[in-house]
């Protein structure tokens, strides 16, 4: 337990500092909303429509796929660096992970989740 004391202190200090910064920003920041400040900003143009419009579900699917494959890359880099030390067990564990991701990708492809009709 004592070996995690530094991590606990760091976590508590970070939490206290973040809370202090947020609290001070509410105290010292001017709170004067006007129509220009609370309106949606669209690259200098007047807003064409409500900023909270509906999105097509395919955008969310693409975002989720991006997150999944981005996480795959974050797992692959440390695995590639330590491949010599982790041996066959680490190799086959990552191969199983990649096979599961590939099966999921093929399933989504066959279901038409990547089609933009």
Curated annotation (Swiss-Prot):
Keywords: Electron transport, Membrane, Mitochondrion, NAD, Respiratory chain, Translocase, Transmembrane, Transmembrane helix, Transport, Ubiquinone. It is an enzyme of class 7 (translocase). InterPro entries: NAD(P)H_OxRDtase_bac/plastid, NADH_UbQ/plastoQ_OxRdtase_su3, NDAH_ubi_oxred_su3_sf. The keyword Electron transport applies. It is found in: Mitochondrion membrane. Gene3D superfamilies: NADH:ubiquinone/plastoquinone oxidoreductase, chain 3. GO terms for molecular function: NADH dehydrogenase (ubiquinone) activity. Its EC number is 7.1.1.2. The chain crosses the membrane at residues 8-28, 61-81, 86-106. Belongs to the complex I subunit 3 family. Core subunit of the mitochondrial membrane respiratory chain NADH dehydrogenase (Complex I) that is believed to belong to the minimal assembly required for catalysis. Complex I functions in the transfer of electrons from NADH to the respiratory chain. The immediate electron acceptor for the enzyme is believed to be ubiquinone. This is NADH-ubiquinone oxidoreductase chain 3.
